[in-house]
């Protein structure tokens, strides 16, 4: 998903209203991507750009709104219109100042003139039956912000949620876990990610694909996270994100969209042709495909969501990797009786469900959908899945535990638990916790991930590990 601004035939008032509807849905616990999927096509691009931007700055918008509006508006949509408009207004004022100083404005920002934001926000409520009577409120709040912005923001940023645009509990946990890096991790989440591709080396070399891109006028470069995994050398980063249909070779299966850190998983397992491999929690299939690009495998791709598993099959077809040796199975990984045939696996990739706290720059609504209690809930689910999967690994086999989380309770704590739970588990070299840290103010090269690799020893009494 890219949140690059897309030209729209709609007035800004329409975009503000659509973005406010998205924000209201997120406040109600719905996924932003699900709501955007229902947005009219001509309005979707601009609404997505604004909605993503608001999600990345929602902590400040919420605090400022609370300061300027004594009582929560009786109409939830009006409350969201104020949050969206205050965010756009602040961005407009910052952009004006940068322009006056001759400094560049971030290309991913949805920038409109200050007077346009105020006028169109008022128009948005004026054209809506349930909000018409609040035109003066919206106008007054926004105009006050333009007059008193500096003083208002100074007060607002006394609240860590407004300062860092993360829930307070999230800030606290990262500060405790990473005293030297928590600020950088929080800052990185507010920068849109680069568009990173994984070259299908069965069809193109990285050099060939870079030449393909160059011929199409697309600037890109190869990237490798040094010294982490042999074979993790197929990542290419585009200078500017663009629709997949505009990139050479999509239909031909030359490449897939996949973050650089996610591309480490398959090489870490060290698979070889002929192995029997399980990709648990496989959807949407990026790591499944990568495994098959590396070797000819007897592979089971497992996922509890049948509709998402269907996407795995579609991806494998596009990449030319579908075969009779690849089995897609819709089942709960923790319930062996529903899917396992009793034949052990040589290698298991357990990319288990998590809070997704490491990918919030891609899905900023996660920040406002998650609750602190979700960490313990997902950690319990992760252990339930690992307990089942370990039984299916043959002695001498490899087990890779993966999450896209930055919370240690879903990462290192789980790795230590595996060692305590299973006397036959031996920990091997793997990256451990990868934090998404910005470089020189630019987006981090990769998302937040955790990797722990284990080998299963033979002839160890494991009766107590159940």
Where are these regions (language model features)?
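S-adenosylmethionine
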Residues: 1-466
